């Protein structure tokens, strides 16, 4: 099986989490003692602008189509990683941080997920680049595409590249993980040489990326592979949030600032990390959006399994004080072999049936 053609759906999310958290640790350590104590003892106002120290992200404006009011101290974010070859986002993770409940939920969105747009290629991984190529804000383009899937605008968004992930992990000393079996694969055409022995060990940045890209030897295919990726992410998160100091911390922060396209301020990052540090490992959960593959417009797509997705959406991502319903979404799904839309309109519907 060709493991190079499709990179890990989660590998860049590792780097995003590590980079964001590292920057926050630096800020937290640099705060004057009195200011740090004040930030911990009083939750910031939900509508307050970012300030020095720590600051909760600004909540996205609640639209008329959303189901209710925002819950206090609950924030949503989009983390994405770039595919250097195609120029599109290769990894998309939508998350919810509940500061009061001390819980973080992260949902992987397949890169080929169909979005209800009039594009030639209607995949969510095109949204960031399509917006930038049109002279618009790439982050807003990605946020808008995700809105149709989720029914709300994410409060914050960050996009980075694969090389940054490798460098960040190396600067922080690697990630300890119990590799379940020997991983060996060679592909000169794609400059891949994976040789990771089984067992508990410290993986460097390159090895972390290779582990998440490896696709052989899984009895249940992608189901087992995604399970391994989630185990790895939990191990990385557990190690990271337990750290009091990190070698080369300033260099990692500099790398994050120079390499990540984000609308998060440094104070926002510090606030979100403080939320993460207060979570136990069991309170950081990873999921994959329920989906099914299908061809449309002569291309292979991933379509949302609507009912299962609504259940997961309300359990893991809903930032409101009432459930999100399908009337709040704008997604295309398959029902009885037919394409349907929750909004009642499929943009350029003839496209779906084009061979």
Regions found by a protein language model. Give the residues of each.
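N-terminal Lys/Arg-rich, disordered targeting/topogenic segments
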Residues: 1-10
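Non-catalytic, solvent-exposed segments at the cell envelope interface
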Residues: 2, 15-16, 25-355
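Sec-dependent N-terminal signal peptides
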Residues: 9-21
């Amino acid at each position: 099986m060709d493991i190079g053609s499709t990179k890990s759906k989660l590998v860049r999310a590792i780097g995003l989490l590590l980079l964001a958290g590292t920057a926050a640790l630096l800020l937290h350590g640099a705060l004057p003692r009195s200011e740090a104590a004040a930030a911990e003892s009083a939750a910031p106002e939900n509508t307050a602008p970012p300030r020095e120290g720590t600051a909760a992200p600004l909540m996205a404006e609640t639209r008329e189509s959303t189901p209710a009011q925002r819950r206090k101290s609950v924030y949503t974010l989009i983390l994405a990683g770039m595919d250097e070859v195609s120029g599109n986002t290769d990894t998309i993770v939508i998350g919810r941080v509940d500061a009061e409940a001390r819980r973080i939920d992260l949902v992987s969105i397949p890169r080929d997920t169909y979005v209800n747009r009039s594009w030639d290629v209607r995949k969510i991984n095109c949204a960031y680049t399509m917006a930038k190529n049109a002279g618009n804000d790439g982050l807003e383009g990605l946020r808008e595409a995700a809105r149709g899937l989720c029914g709300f605008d994410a409060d914050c968004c960050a996009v980075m590249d694969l090389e940054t992930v490798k460098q960040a992990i190396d600067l922080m000393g690697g990630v300890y993980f119990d590799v379940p079996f020997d991983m060996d694969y060679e592909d000169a055409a794609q400059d891949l040489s994976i040789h990771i022995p089984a067992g508990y060990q410290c993986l460097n940045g390159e090895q972390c990326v290779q582990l998440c890209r490896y696709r052989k030897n899984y009895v249940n295919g992608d189901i087992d592979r995604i399970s391994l990726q989630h185990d790895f992410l939990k191990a990385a998160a557990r190690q990271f949030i337990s750290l009091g100091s990190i070698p080369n911390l300033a260099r990692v922060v500099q790398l994050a600032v120079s390499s990540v396209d984000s609308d998060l301020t440094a104070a926002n990052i510090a606030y979100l990390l403080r939320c993460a540090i207060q979570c136990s490992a069991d309170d950081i959960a990873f999921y994959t959006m329920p989906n099914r593959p299908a061809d449309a417009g002569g291309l292979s797509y991933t379509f949302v399994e609507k009912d299962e997705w609504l259940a997961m959406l309300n359990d893991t991502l809903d930032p409101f004080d009432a459930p999100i319903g399908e009337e709040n979404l704008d997604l295309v799904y398959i029902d009885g072999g037919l394409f349907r839309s929750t909004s009642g309109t499929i943009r350029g519907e003839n496209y779906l049936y084009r061979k």
